[in-house]
């Protein structure tokens, strides 16, 4: 809400445009000085049109600073945290200001981009145009195997549900997610029973007999209170999930899908972090390979 207010000091009037907003249960304000003369109704509307976006950004900056101070982390510096919080509050403001049609178009575009980014790291990835074509036609474009089409359609459905599913994340829900992704193939929803490796890495995942315990430990860590930023926690969860490698196949698709849900719940667009999925392949059991490579908007 943007409105005109007057302040009086030593008998002199000063006029400001003020935007009020709620943060953490309290009302905060940002303002812009207009001068000592009160604008008429026409001029006030012109000034509102001129300065509303500026005040909106000032409110976002204020909220980002206050919010970033609540996290304690060994991984991200202050500016990176601030950039993430700016992104979160900017996404929230854009969503509030968008029309219903704009939201629908953006959701459709982001869904294609996110699924393309997820599948780009899988074996036999599809092109962006392939995925768009499958979405438009709900059938296999010429030359594409039916299994890939079904995988894309499953990812489309699960992408719409993943935020809610991550809200109740547990071993059973992860198994169900894997089962739903590979529905009809007979290979979904079961923890691996054989040894595994990480392609291109010297790191060896835990033996099959320890997978269930490792997964339970990771989930316990996820649900424990933490001073880390949600983005960091999502990155660390994803990284460790890939190390555990709980399934015979589909670990990358499931891990990235879960991380998408974590980012969405944190108010961060999953499409902003597609580069992360390429960087994760550089790491074994360390976080250092990510430092300096994740580009956080400032």
Predicted regions and their residues:
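FIC/Doc superfamily catalytic core
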Residues: 2-249, 253-298
């Amino acid at each position: 809400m943007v409105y005109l207010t007057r302040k009086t000091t030593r008998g002199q009037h000063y006029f400001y445009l003020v935007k009020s907003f709620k943060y953490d249960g309290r009302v905060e304000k940002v303002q812009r000085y207009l001068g000592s003369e009160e604008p008429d109704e026409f001029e006030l509307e012109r000034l509102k049109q001129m300065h509303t976006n500026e005040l909106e950004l000032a409110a976002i900056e204020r909220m980002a600073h206050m919010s970033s101070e609540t996290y304690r982390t060994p991984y991200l510096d202050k500016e990176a945290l601030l950039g993430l919080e700016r992104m979160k509050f900017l996404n929230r403001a854009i969503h509030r200001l968008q029309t219903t049609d704009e939201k629908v178009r953006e959701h459709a575009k982001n869904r294609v981009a996110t699924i393309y980014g997820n599948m780009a790291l899988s074996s036999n990835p599809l092109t962006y145009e392939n995925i768009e074509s499958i979405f438009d036609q709900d059938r296999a474009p010429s030359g594409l195997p039916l299994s890939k089409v079904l995988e894309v359609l499953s990812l489309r459905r699960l992408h719409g549900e993943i935020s809610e599913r991550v809200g109740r994340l547990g071993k059973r829900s992860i198994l169900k997610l894997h089962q739903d992704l590979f529905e009809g193939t007979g290979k979904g929803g079961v923890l691996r029973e054989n040894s595994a490796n990480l392609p291109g890495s010297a790191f060896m995942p835990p033996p099959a007999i320890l997978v269930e315990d490792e997964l339970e430990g990771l989930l316990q860590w996820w649900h424990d209170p933490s001073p880390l930023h949600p983005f960091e926690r999502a990155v660390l969860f994803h990284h460790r999930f890939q190390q555990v490698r709980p399934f015979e196949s589909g670990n990358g698709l499931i891990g990235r899908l879960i991380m998408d849900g974590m980012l969405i719940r944190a108010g961060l667009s999953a499409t902003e972090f597609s580069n992360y999925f390429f960087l994760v392949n550089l790491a074994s059991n360390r976080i250092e390979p990510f430092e300096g490579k994740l580009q956080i908007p400032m």
